[in-house]
Amino acid sequence: DAQSKKPFTYLLVDEFQDCNSVQYEIIKMLYTTGGNVFAVGDDDQAIYGFRGADPGIMQRFRKEYVNADQVVLGRNYRCVPEIVDVSAKVIACNRQRVSKQLTSGREAGGSVLLKGFPGGAEERSYILEQCQGKTPLELERFAVLFRTNSSMGVFEAQLMQAGIPFVTREKITSVYGHFVTRDVMDYFRAAYGCRERQLFLRIWNRPRLRVGRESLDSPVVDFGRIRRFYSEAPYENPAAVRDVEQFERKLEQLGRFSLELGITFIRRGFGYEDYLRRKAGSNRELLENWLEILDWLEEDCRGHENFEKWERCQEQAARQLSQEGTGGNTQKKGIHILTMHAAKGLEYDRVFLMDVNEGTIPYHKAV
């Protein structure tokens, strides 16, 4: 309306790097000749690209408002020189940014250690070792940062199993309730004699069998009955019969394996890993998270005499996590596990960055 289009004398824009194109157009509509725009931002701290924020607008602003003065605040008062120097080298690889010289306003006194691992299991084990023997008050100054909270579940379970106190600021999906964990446990339950219809409806097509729900018309699954169902008209299907026979044989094999070998057999013998690859599609990070849970299950089952004891231990751990609650529990003392997004503006004496692998950090779709 006429009132909103009336020129503003002054306009202050904060967190300019998080501005999207629509917001920028509104700014230009509000600002007319004779006004003063004061925009504050740091394109190196842009974290809202998922909702349309475009830090490139800061460069557009400089081109469209050629008379604007630019003041670069290049001194960092939060981090020691060692961290600022290493960070600046990494950030400088981004060519689509406002060039700036970064320095530290603090005395030297820190270090950055780059440590490589064969895989995620070894990486997590290293951090657990660094936490052993520390008091909750000492761990309060530690933080482990992940790119997304979907990657935290396995580490959360390992911290709890190791008796290491931890604090979460976000809701973490429990690894014990994850569909991958449920599927693996269901395969074992079926191998050890469970014939509940609902269980088989969950695993029947993971991987896909040429068997339909119509053959599971009883609360208790009977393989002989299913074979007969597909051996006679009108549902005669020799391929389905072969699938059922093969599935039954694999369950018998699974029941004879140790737990650890059994998980490997589920992954490859049943083709569950291939099923996860198809389900994840092009989402590489999602697949890696799922495969990490399978790796963790192989670790977690070790030391348990049989499936019944392992299942009971998992149920107890799941209850403990549920009782402690996840997300927003900031009163207890312990190591902090959180996403990089949630860590913005916070300070810790020792920080572990997880999964610093090409394609994960930064995410391959973000570059």
Residue ranges of model-derived segments:
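Conserved helicase NTPase motor core
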Residues: 1-59, 75, 79, 337, ...
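Accessory C-terminal helicase-associated subdomains
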Residues: 232-342, 363-365
